Amino acid sequence: MADKADKMKARLPRGFVDRVPDDLRAAEKMMATIREVYDLYGFEPVETPLVEYTDALGKFLPDQDRPNEGVFSFQDDDEQWLSLRYDLTAPLARYVAENFETLPKPYRSYRNGWVFRNEKPGPGRFRQFMQFDADTVGAPNVSADAEMCMMMADTLERLGIQRGDYAIRVNNRKVLDGVLDAIGLEGEGNAAKRLNVLRAIDKLDKFGPEGVRLLLGKGRLDESGDFTKGAQLPEAAIEKVLAFTAAGGADGAQTIANLQAVVAGNAKGEEGVQELADMQALFFAGGYEGRVKIDPSVVRGLEYYTGPVFEAELLFDVTNEDGQKVVFGSVGGGGRYDGLVSRFRGEPVPATGFSIGVSRLMTALKNLGKLDVSDTVGPVVVLVMDKDTQNLGRYQKMVSDLRKAGIRAEMYVGGSGMKAQMKYADRRAAPCVVIQGSQEREAGEVQIKDLVEGKRLSAEIEDNVTWLESRPAQITVREDGLVDAVREILDAQARDRAEQSK
């Protein structure tokens, strides 16, 4: 036996989580519904590798000031730098560029998968998480952007989120870029300062207008004493940006009118406002008014967005770690990124897309009781009473017969006795167990114990003698009637679950 000092400690790397069966089933249940909606809209699945050449991913990580900071990278044997993907959009751009001549244009695709960020982990902030994206490449018109917003609204409703409990919020980066140009932040030389402004605006929901004012200026001191350096804008520029964020009106038409006043005289900003007006008309035509709204506070952190940007926000309250009621907030977002594919092609390739944060949306659905997998039925467990080869073969045939009938089943393969096997079956959430000892075998019979009914009856029968005499929820059947008897038990349990859920 190894010395205790030589034992390796089992530990999970920081920022990563293990996923247990219920989480996996819940995620698959949710993603199956998302796929149904995306398929309904005519999108096709595609999958790209976890690893890409680092230069193919670009320099677009959110909240990072240095190129490719925050990416897990390594060199291969050719000394080429490779990185784990940090989102699903940059790999899609590479895929489309590499297969451009064979793909239909516009190219409509969806994909889900793991992405990785080499960032400091914290509560709710992981280094590995799953996204579910849909994108249209090759469509220059904002009808493609509007469709993304409408598809996201339909997806949330298909998942059981009621109208009024969510909003798809829409803005246009051209409008914001027009404002930034007007205050002297145009050009690549001001990229870092523009990013600071975006970060400040993105904190509007958290800190309010006055907090954003501080972040646009010299900086903000929070309650803990930590100081966040601001964007160092002059007062006139701060007022211009705050006027932009405050342009939201009672409805889309009023918001658009307010934005027109903010960007009047700036061609880029006016173009962005017109695109929002066109999208608003499409939302009304499709019956999405009230579900999708124009909101100037939506900025999205990624630098590659070039036009409309959108965010899916859940509006119901949840209790945070401090016991306070807070709005759940964003579960996904996206926008137009006309420059990503163009990097590879050397010609304009318009594109737009939407990304769902799978884990965050799962949390929301669980809070609403819309993703319950507690009724998952475990396997029927065939207990092993005799371990000689001949009898093991007999138990194995029972399992095979059940599986051929489409019934999930397993033979106990551990080394424990009857009591431990029953405990194992209980932990596996087995609906019933199959028992055949020497007496049953000689009679050509099997015992089937309904564990679900047994638990229910055990709560009603308090006297141990009565319990032993009644042998509740246990039947004996001919061996050749095993499958039919098990199916009857499973069907009865299914009816009970359906009745209880009403």
From Swiss-Prot:
It comes from the Bacteria. Keywords: Aminoacyl-tRNA synthetase, ATP-binding, Cytoplasm, Ligase, Nucleotide-binding, Protein biosynthesis. One of its GO terms (molecular function) is ATP binding. InterPro entries: aa-tRNA-synth_II, aa-tRNA-synth_II/BPL/LPL, Anticodon-bd, Anticodon-bd_dom_sf, His-tRNA-ligase, HisRS-like_core, HisRS/HisZ, HisRS_anticodon. The keyword Glycoprotein does not apply. NCBIfam families: hisS. This is Histidine--tRNA ligase.
